[in-house]
Amino acid sequence: MPEQLNTRVEDCFQLAESFFKRPFKRPVVSLKLRGQKAGVAHLHENLLRFNPQLYRENTEDFLKQTVAHEVAHLIAHQLFGERIQPHGEEWQLIMRGVYELPPNRCHTYDVKRRSVTRYIYRCPCAESDFPFSAQRHKLVAQGRRYLCRRCRQTLVYSGETRVE
């Protein structure tokens, strides 16, 4: 899996070198990115991080568009310096001119959200539930109190959980 990714990164750099007729410093490539982002270019560290799940699920478009998108950020930074917009004219020039791709800012990959457990708290005055995150539930266990906005009574854990 990473071989194709590294090959595409190298291909993108070679296209840029051919287009601009100058060498560019190669980045470190990592598959340590989670969440909604498909890729991130760390300009000062010369590092590219890619999301392995989105890569697996969208390999063809990922290799074509996402890799070029992130490499274009590094190329733009090496060519034009710090004072450019992330998706500004310089980056767009590279996307269109070098890679002949549309300069899309965001991907359209289907991102699966992980399930989240909510801890149900209740107030003595109302029938309403207050779903707490794991972090907030832990804070309650450590002594933090949360009050009902209506009656100002302390919310109490019901013993119930819900997976969203």
UniProtKB/Swiss-Prot annotation:
Drop me one GO molecular function for this one.
zinc ion binding
GO cellular component entries: cytoplasm
Q: How is the cofactor bound?
A: Binds 1 zinc ion.
Alphabetically list the UniProt keywords.
Answer: Cytoplasm, Metal-binding, Zinc
Give the protein's cofactors: Zn(2+)
Biological processes annotated in GO: response to stress
Recorded hits in Pfam families, A to Z, give:
SprT-like (PF10263)
Alphabetical list of PROSITE patterns matching this protein: ZINC_PROTEASE
Summarize where Zn(2+) binds, as residue positions. Answer: H69, H73
Q: Tell me which residues this entry annotates as catalytic.
A: E70
Record-annotated SprT-like domain positions: 14-156
Q: Where in the cell is it found?
A: Cytoplasm
Predominant location category = cytoplasm
Q: Does the keyword Iron-sulfur apply?
A: no
Q: Which InterPro entries match?
A: SprT-like_domain, Uncharacterised_SprT
User: Which family does this protein fall into?
Assistant: Belongs to the SprT family.
Which PANTHER family does this chain map to?
PROTEIN SPRT (PTHR38773:SF1)
UniProt name for this protein: Protein SprT
